[in-house]
Amino acid sequence: MPNFVADFHIHSRYSRACSKDLSVAELAKWAKIKGIGVLGTGDFTHPLWLDEIKTALRETGTGLFEAKNGTQFMLTAEVNTLFYKEGKAHQIHHILLAPSIEAAERINQELEPFGSLSLDGRPTLRMEAWRLVEVVLGIEPRCLVVPAHAWTPWFAIFGSTSGF
């Protein structure tokens, strides 16, 4: 079986604590050097980053996108859901994967009322996790919603400090 390397949990320069030098072209260059077969775009929820994605990548019709150097990308974003249960705050990070620009744009339209998408590449949405899944899959059933860094203490579905 051939080896295949993918990284879907990545961020743009619009996320806190990330390099301001990040660009789609730089990500494509380094993915090629490191042997990554498919790289997530990260942060498709941020309007300026989505504009760059649309300019820098070509949609292939397979759910993947291609950079000028041939690097394959998948549309990804990380969001933080913030909700309260039994008087206790819970925050969970999720990775969203979308098969098309149209799906990403529709997701952004539906999520904007729950939190400003332009403040951070990893926006905080005031909604329960189940509602996020319902919204995203209701837009496009081929989308995926998966917990990010599930075992870390902070902002993880199984995290010791996530409020569960």
Descriptions of predicted regions:
Residues D7, T41, T76:
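Generic enzyme active-site microenvironment
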Residues V5-S15, F44:
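Histidine-centered catalytic micro-motifs
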Residues P2-N3, D51-F164:
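Extended substrate/RNA-proximal surfaces in nucleic-acid metabolism proteins
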Residues A28-P47, L144-V146:
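Divalent metal-dependent hydrolysis catalytic cores, especially in the metallo-beta-lactamase
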Residues S19-A31:
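Short, acidic/polar
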Residues Y14-C18, G121-T124:
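Short, flexible loop segments at the rims of nucleotide/cofactor-binding pockets, characterized by
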